[in-house]
Amino acid sequence: MKSATCRLANFLGCFFLVLSSCVSGIALAADAEQWGVWETSLDGPREGDPYLEVQLSAVFSRDGKRIQVPGFYDGEGVYKVRFSPPAPGQWRYETRSNRPELNGKGGSFTAGPAAADNHGPVEVFKTFYLRYADGTPYHQFGTTCYAWIHQTKELQQQTLRTLAVSPFNKIRFCVFPKAYTYNQNEPELFAFHKEAEGKFDFDRPDPAFWRHFEQRILDLQRLGIEADLILWHPYDRWGFADMSDPQDDRYLRYCIARLSAYRNVWWSLANEFDFMTDRPKNHRGNKQMDDWDRFFQILQKEDPHGRLRGIHNGRVWYDHTRDWVTHASLQTSNMAGGVGYRAQYQKPVIYDECRYEGDIPQGWGNLTPREMTQRFWLGTMSGCYVGHGETYKHPQDILWWSKGGVLHGESPQRIRWLRDVMAQAPSFDELQPLGDDQGRYLLAKPGEYYLLYSPDSRPQSVDLAGDRPYKVDLVDPWEMAALPLGTAQPGEYTVRPAKSDLAYRFTPYAPGEKLRPEAKISASPTEGVPPLTVTFRSETDAAAAWDFGDGATSAQNPATHTFEQPGFYTVTLRVTGRDGGSAVNQVQIAVDRNTDEPIVRAAYAEGETPALTMKGTAKRGPDGIIQLPDGQPWGWVKAGDGVLEDLRGLRSFTIIGSVKPDSLEIGSGGNRILFCLNKDHSGIDLVCHPDGRLRLAVNQWPDRIRNDSSPGKLVVGKWTRFAVTYDATKAADNVRWHFSRPQDVPEAAAVALDRKTTYNVGPVAGDIGPLAIGNFNETMHASGLDRQFRGQIRCLQIFGSRASGRGAMSLEEIGKR
């Protein structure tokens, strides 16, 4: 793996490399290294339209191998042919053209051996994997900067400096500029000539742009980074997405002729290809499904260097089983599906877009750093490759995902650490993904290496082959730490994670190697409210050292510690034997918030939390009542500024409130009383249906679930008090619905149990959306606001617990609120 220091040194040396190339000129043009670029320039016709009228290619031959390479027009009467020799030795060439002054030109050149840092192009290996042409392993850790080459020169240089010290060895970016949210700047250069009146001539490439583009590909190559070139996309205001079929084909062939000789080039036919066909709002394109097939066939047949070929999806997935697709380039957040995607496509699978780390309102751009890191682990453990992106708000809209610049997030350093972990393991192509699509993640070379990942805290088992004991290491992806956990005997071994997001590494002891001591912990109690005093005991005689996870430590055994603040604390015990060997173990202590205090208190005359902002037609009534009139343009209530942290990860919760519908007419799927899903997943959604029943969805879109109250509980023109509880610690009857009788005035009324339902999808996920009352939040506004609750809401409260079932209140507790 190329180090960041080495990358930076290479980048700083680029100027001198370019300078020496210019000085040596003809000498360098006459020779090349294996997998480098050899180029010849020819003088030809200037008159007419060379791009449309002149055909040029050359046949390169060596030892009976013949390769036909297309040429291209570079402006000012200059024609070029570029070739990347796949083998060292003497190569001969002869040009072919429909113009006599370009036809029959020939000669020879010598390709030398590849330089030490030139491993050749990346290619598919053993069905599911990637490697360099010289056999060097290549484990893709990608990132995305869609429009970085369309920014100022200063910003492009800053992006290169950032990449030089990053963990990324592939970057996805577009040939054409992008017109989209946070992307409104006008580039200096375009792929085609811009006429005086502002229109583009799609039959006349601009050589200045292409020379600039090539330089950026070479800049990346010197940093050891693959350039995944996106040829089309639907985010366009200049017309590039709507070129004619002949113009599209000529453009593609021009890209092949100019760019395929660079060994770090990959082809991505499109970003969200299907959005150029069905054209959702603010998307452009005139492509049909047959067009994408044709483009792939052109690449497959006419790219003389056989670069990798993929296509990125929006909602519709391309058929990646087709033989002209070399790898499956996916946009999906289904990280559990990796093993299945490999089996389905029988090709390398790359999660090129699994959402981005950031803080923008859009659901695709607000992963936490921990979630971005976790997705890299989940994809890797499934035998797949993963891509990164970053979308933190910036006063000048310089978001890495599109414009580059600098990285602000916390996931890149952890992605680097994962890359180091994998570099220390057997080669990726030797590791089998032995997990499934149900939450089991195991990567193994049986008998030699096992890496078991636990995204949650459920116990998991692994069957260790052979007759030697194994060293067990506790691997913490977020803390970037690998700790000696102890010893596992061959056979079935069960891990019991102290917290979520941990991995366990198993490697056999060498013959004669001393076994580690055992670290065993007992702790009581393990959960409660602050101040919580816990007694810890090490169950071995070895010297004990405790780290309580809140900055406090102890060398006593037993040890007692008091936790003063709510939180989840990972307590670590390290034991050291007389021979100096050590091992660790961990236990998690859950110190819960006071569940008697509401997380949300809304639609009150005073004492609300968090602060509420009325949006659209939403307004206040007497005593803080929220009024949501029936009819366009609709309204909603914003609760707080961004995601409410205390709603993340709730294992149990209670929602209490009073509602008075003015109408039970609904938008598609039902009207929202409260909504904190992140688009269509992760969070809580409480929905009103036209027959007066409510539905609760957790972490999923509600349309296909059946977790409902009885019908007829809400009545038009009447106030009804309700309470719904959810308890993920219970296997059955974990949801309880309570309602009062409908009444004319908004007074406190006793509720009674309506029904119990079994609906358990686990705790509320961590990557929730912001809370909205009475309608969708910002992550779903693009789908319309007619899902507004049509009426009034009063005294709405949410209580919850991350640690236990205490957040699901009893009927008696509800009656006190």
Give residue ranges: language-model regions.
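Short, aromatic/His-centered strand-loop micro-motif at the edge of beta-sheets
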Residues: 696-721
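Aromatic- and carboxylate-lined catalytic core of secreted/periplasmic carbohydrate-active enzymes
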Residues: 30-32, 49-50, 136, 358-360, ...
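Extracellular glycan-recognition modules
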Residues: 593-611, 619-622, 630-697, 729-734, ...
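Active-site mouth of glycoside hydrolases
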Residues: 100, 119-327, 331-337
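Catalytic-core region of carbohydrate-active enzymes that cleave or remodel glycosidic bonds
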Residues: 306, 322-396
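Flexible glycan-contacting loops in extracellular carbohydrate-active proteins
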Residues: 748-792
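Extracellular/lumenal mature domains of secreted and surface-exposed proteins
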Residues: 31-75, 94-111, 513-596
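Short tryptophan-centered beta-strand motifs in secreted/extracellular beta-sheet-rich domains
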Residues: 216, 227, 717-728, 737
